[in-house]
Design a protein with these regions (language model features):
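Membrane-associated feature with strongest affinity for ZDHHC
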Residues: 2-299
Length: 299
């Protein structure tokens, strides 16, 4: 249905209720082709089941680091968690490796993994999760008159109104009290990246988690292998204790992050968010279009 057809229908209809029906295969049936629009309101039409035309804001990108605000402490602590481990290995462990070639290899690999992890971290911090368009504000009374409903497969959902942003929210959008914006397909707000994870940065967040997993794995392997390769007297008791404590810390981080990583791989594969999974929203997951199609939505 194009805009001209909608405008022609507007001249014939005098009702204040909008019913928007959208089938999973994007082909509107005869019943869903009837869109009733108030003659004194702008046309509100959904291009597909996922993103309303005037709600798209994927061009909005963040250019400044989010190193301020109520969660800046967690932001800086996360930075230190990445820099201190490899920095301490460079100072206390790498110099004790006898073979120069192994010393160089470990130095390069360790620092390279750290730099890649830091890059992926800043990529998430500075990315835009996707925001609702604030240029289309309406009042609560207008929202109640419109009463927008969206039908997906055999399930019907009423689109909610955000009283803070004064807009009709997309089906999977939620208002974040930290970002003070409505986030498209909000998964969760992550204090460690001081940013929301949403429609346009969920994949970046997953890549960051994978980098952290490899970072922890390298630290574990290095701390376990080094004492066996080098003589104890060369390392000294202090360094051995340091490596044991460091290995235990890396193992605890690894055991925490790996399940978290796989949980996000699973959620993307079935097209669910953390919020929907915890609150059991979207029962039977009507938005699941198959693994490949679900991954295309975040890529």
């Amino acid at each position: 249905m194009n805009k001209e057809e909608i405008n022609n229908n507007n001249n014939q209809l005098n009702t204040n209720i909008i019913h928007i029906g959208i089938e999973n295969n994007n082909n509107l049936n005869e019943e869903n082709n009837n869109i009733n629009i108030s003659t004194n309101r702008k046309n509100i039409f959904y291009e597909n089941k996922e993103t309303p035309i005037y709600f798209c804001s994927n061009s909005e990108k963040r250019i400044f680091l989010k190193c301020y605000g109520p969660e800046s402490c967690a932001f800086y602590c996360t930075l230190l968690l990445f820099i201190i481990p490899i920095g301490s290995l460079n100072i206390f462990a790498f110099p004790k490796i006898k073979k120069k070639i192994w010393k160089i290899i470990n130095f390069i690999i360790g620092d390279l993994i750290m730099l890649i992890t830091l890059f992926s971290y800043f990529n998430v911090v500075t990315s835009s999760p996707g925001y609702e368009d604030l240029n289309k504000k309406i009042t609560k009374n207008e929202y109640e008159e419109i009463n927008p409903v969206i039908k997906i497969k055999n399930s019907t959902f009423k689109l909610k109104y955000c009283e803070t942003c004064q807009i009709i929210r997309h089906l999977r959008s939620f208002h974040c009290k930290y970002c003070n914006k409505c986030i498209l397909r909000q998964d969760h707000h992550c204090a460690y990246v001081n940013n929301c994870i949403g429609k346009y940065n969920h994949l970046k967040f997953l890549i960051f988690l994978i980098c952290v997993d490899f970072y922890c794995l390298y630290c574990i392997i290095f701390c376990i292998v080094l004492p066996f390769k080098e003589k104890k007297k060369n390392l000294g008791l202090g360094r051995i204790i340091y490596l044991i404590v460091f290995a235990l810390f890396a193992i605890s981080m690894f055991l925490t992050m790996v399940p978290f990583t796989f949980s996000h791989i699973y959620l993307i594969s079935v097209n669910k968010t953390t919020r929907e999974d915890i609150k059991n929203e979207l029962y039977d997951n009507v938005l699941n279009n198959g693994c490949c199609e679900n991954w295309k939505e975040v890529c």
